[in-house]
Amino acid sequence: MSYILVTGGAGYIGSHTVVELVNNGYNVVVVDNLVNSSYDVIVRIEVLTRKQIPFFKIDLNDHDALDQVFKLYPIQAVLHFAALKAVGESTKFPLNYYSNNVGGAISLLKVMEENNVKNIVFSSSATVYGDATRFENMIPIPEHCPTGPTNPYGETKITIENIIRDVYANDKSWKCAILRYFNPIGAHPSGLIGEDPLGIPNNLLPFLAQVAIGRREKLSVFGSDYNSKDGTPIRDYIHVIDLAKGHIAALNYLFNHKDNGLCREWNLGTGNGSTVFEVFNAFCEAVGKKLPFEVVGRRDGDVLNLTANPKRANTELKWKAQLSINDACKDLWNWTTKNPFGFQINNYSWTKFDSESLTNYDRLNTVRTFNGKFEVSISNHGATIVAAKLNGIKLNLGFDNLKGYLREDNPFFGATIGRVANRISKGDLLINGTHYQVGLNELHRTSLHGGTYGYNKRTFLGPIVKTNEKEKETTMEFVLIDLDGTEGYPGDVETKVIYTVRDTGVGGELGIEYEAKLLEESGRDSTAVSLTNHSYWNIGNQPSIEGTHIKLVSNKHLESNPLDSTPTGKIVTSTDLDSQNSAKLGPDGPVFDYCFVTKQQDKLDTRNDELRVVATATHPKTRIAFTTLTTEPAFQFYTGDGVDVAGVFTKRSGFCLEASRYIYNPKWFIPLNKGEVYGSYTIYRFENF
Amino acid sequence: MSYILVTGGAGYIGSHTVVELVNNGYNVVVVDNLVNSSYDVIVRIEVLTRKQIPFFKIDLNDHDALDQVFKLYPIQAVLHFAALKAVGESTKFPLNYYSNNVGGAISLLKVMEENNVKNIVFSSSATVYGDATRFENMIPIPEHCPTGPTNPYGETKITIENIIRDVYANDKSWKCAILRYFNPIGAHPSGLIGEDPLGIPNNLLPFLAQVAIGRREKLSVFGSDYNSKDGTPIRDYIHVIDLAKGHIAALNYLFNHKDNGLCREWNLGTGNGSTVFEVFNAFCEAVGKKLPFEVVGRRDGDVLNLTANPKRANTELKWKAQLSINDACKDLWNWTTKNPFGFQINNYSWTKFDSESLTNYDRLNTVRTFNGKFEVSISNHGATIVAAKLNGIKLNLGFDNLKGYLREDNPFFGATIGRVANRISKGDLLINGTHYQVGLNELHRTSLHGGTYGYNKRTFLGPIVKTNEKEKETTMEFVLIDLDGTEGYPGDVETKVIYTVRDTGVGGELGIEYEAKLLEESGRDSTAVSLTNHSYWNIGNQPSIEGTHIKLVSNKHLESNPLDSTPTGKIVTSTDLDSQNSAKLGPDGPVFDYCFVTKQQDKLDTRNDELRVVATATHPKTRIAFTTLTTEPAFQFYTGDGVDVAGVFTKRSGFCLEASRYIYNPKWFIPLNKGEVYGSYTIYRFENF
């Protein structure tokens, strides 16, 4: 197993190329100093590609840190994107540009040489040509056009090109592809990744997008007196997806070039020039309205025409841009509407949750409501609710770090439970007439909460964090790909857990949406899914749940087989609730561990059902009211009498309200078939009364 | 007080420029990573200029260390020499060149910018022009000749030029002089500094010098079929002193250019081309013999003619090369014969002696004899003999570090004693009829050993270390400039202390030569000088001198005034010596503290006198024989009965044999007059019997 190292993999072009690399079967390691990008990009790439991407926050000038990455992963080739890239800024802070771009490249090349990694694809730029109109017959620009950058940014690019050529000249075993980009535009069609410039965008389309979404007043067109059909300058705009694919083509070219090294430049452009007005009109069409603009004076250093001659790449790399400016505008607008402020989410933050890991796969993701009263922290490990707080009061049981959750005596604190929640007698799962033996983890008698390696033990991808100011809510979407055969369950299942942290004015609430489907590529036609969350709540701000008043919507629950706690198939009436379906929890009783049912189980996806209050709990000491609402037909109410986390938590430290399906029993069971969707929605609401 | 920071100040051109800077009244700080140079260069510059030069061993890529220097010294301008400079090597290790040269320059410029230092003189190279013969009419090469280097070394130089131009373009308050050197040759006429290439020299004259001195067999002439008068290529050779002066001219130009910034390139060349054979012949003439050579094939990348057009520097900088190729050859040969192996002395090493100082002014300099038996360590502080060892046995009293020597109770251990050794009654010094009051430091009654701030407390410059394989000796020359008025003594006196560590076959010896003169610029006609060394010897490898047999050449000593231990003017006979002038030293006696006289005091410079054995000491336990030889007319023999260094040394831990003049008394005193030289020579020899 070998890896492609992508520097600047969290940047605009880098991120799109990482997606293409993964789609083409390459393993990728990303390093990025994140000065101009966000780790959220990596998270989104992981969700998009359903793959974990090893990531290291490293500045390329840090030789030793970079070397460490080469020691950890067998690197086969480097795609070197990392660079500062704003032309205007480069004239103001040239030394930052030289230090970051040239210094970084030198350091990278040294580490590569020291580790005997000699394949590199370098992100150069059409800027190296400078004003190609200074020559006769150099539009469209071929690779042999003499270079002559007119700003420090372009100088850094040509300098790095020269360094790479000198490295190759000395050691002909290097394989170096120098890719000169023209004007990349557009975004990933998924709307998950795209360009996210900090500050005022320098480029036409990102600026236009901000005008369209209402962040900028109007577009300034720098000169309409050029010698083009409409007076505005001509550029070669290339969809970032096409550009990303150009890197795959270049990389494959290097790998297929087996006999000796090479060092060669390729233009990546479409070969077709478009004027500013043409692009402006295409984007207005994508948005569906005419956007405001103003023609102002020419900008220093702008020239009439910078169109690529891409023939060398077309023929040698067998690569050609496929997408149109209209495609790019559509994708950009999709990205912009879905992420009006790019990756920036103010009320979201994360820290590493697995402090012993070199990677960031397991993080603790925290979102606070807009009113600042309610805060929830979710770990990637088990998509677990690690902490929920109302006005600073902790509402649930949990540990501070991953180690706690790995304890043998951890009673599923806060975890997502799946693939099938609760117990399956003898692990005998019957789906559409076929018996499956699923993992037994209770004295080889029952399968509990998905078995030994249930969802509570898995590392979820994500979260994709989005915020909706109008609804005063922020969502964190986690994804798990649960492969066929794991713990005996059939079929590849994609499970999404979408947490919504919502401001309710007087308090806050946490919505949990589950969605699961059998993946197309899965070899199975049906499977079983039943999901819930196993949080232990304690609203008394004290060690015990004692004093909590509880009121349930129903006093009917499934009858348990006393041998293994699985349902007998009968529904019985609780004897521990009063006539109002209420109870006051004492130090030792009443003891609840029953699956209460509120309605018939008749749907695979309950999300369109009424969202009903199924339980309320209050505590006189803290005056916190805790309401559980769900679309689900049942909920397990458990007073935590079996909790025994040595030295930390004892019995009745917290209670569970696990909105869910009926506990598995063939008579109630609804399978998940190919093409169907499993879904549910539950809210835990916390307010002071 | 402001400073010029010189990067690469220990290198060939840098070191010569530092000398010129100091000669022109500038204060200099040097940083150098010493990868291709030696700290000895700095020591020699200090001796040459009689100034301490703050030096920091820093790699320019170490931003924080460099920043620290800017915080410590108010830097006015930077002369940036530091670079790797071998064209051939640069094609083999291009990344080292980019990292060191380009990376280093970027880091330096960033630190300058951060510290608001915006004056720079940059060492560029004629190499940036590449092959100027590719154009019509570009020989001699003017500054407007298009650049186009043909190797990574030249690429690094043009890249740094571009970076500097970009920095200036953004901030017009910078003043940047870009100096393009042609072919520097020659050495400082003092023979103290010169070019010292490691490995095989790349350049014509250093190679030739090594042929002349016998380190290389013959010169290879790369092609004699060029279109020149003798068929060899033409270059513009410039004496390194002229080149150094060009930097002073450029610096002054920057400082005089007051109204705004500037960034400009200047060629530093003579304007006259010389062929390889012309230079070869000039050097043969300097050496006085025909040197062997062989014509071989042309070298890749060599071109016919690289001669400067230096008119811009001539007119704008008002600088013009003055010295000829013959001057350069003479100076190079002088440097080569005086330093056949450059700065490389294998049996010499140094460590910092003042561990708390940021500078290296006070070092501990250690030389070992060729036979490895005898080793001496001298500190710059007091040019003090800190340690002498025979076969690992310590022979003297001393401390491990500077702190010990600064103790109040340090009885002048190992120190150089001056300006006048021993006691002057009432500090009343009579020189040619004039009374001088010199520093009283013994209960305001006598001046002892030069006063409170005697030579033992001064930091000496040097050592200049040279080795003579034939004589099996290595010399360390220290210099002190003792200014008029210090401790009341009249006149600026230059004092040299030259230690020679010599292999005697069965053991080793330490020669001490003293030389002093009144400096020309001194306002005085005469002064007093009397120098000695105050080592305490102990050859018994035990805490006390007990058991040492001592035999003196004379039993006559000066009579002491019991009131203040100054001489009465009478010479008396010792009562503590036997008929052989011998004594065996016991735990408490005999007690000696007398100035024994061996001959009349009749000369200011005794160095041409007979070198006589004046004392021998042996110890039966170690079987070490210690012989003192001197040209001096007297010696103080002291059994150390006053030693009391709390917790470290007690009385009779060591004895002194201070070869010297008679203790000061007007009737014996010989003044040092202008134009005269004070001198003496003493040897301490240690051998096993």
From Swiss-Prot, chains A, B:
GO terms for cellular component: cytosol
Top EC class, one word: isomerase
Active-site positions on this chain: 534
Region (Mutarotase): 346-689
Family: In the N-terminal section; belongs to the NAD(P)-dependent epimerase/dehydratase family.
NCBIfam families: galE, PRK10675.1
UniProt name for this protein: Bifunctional protein GAL10
Organism: Pachysolen tannophilus (Yeast)
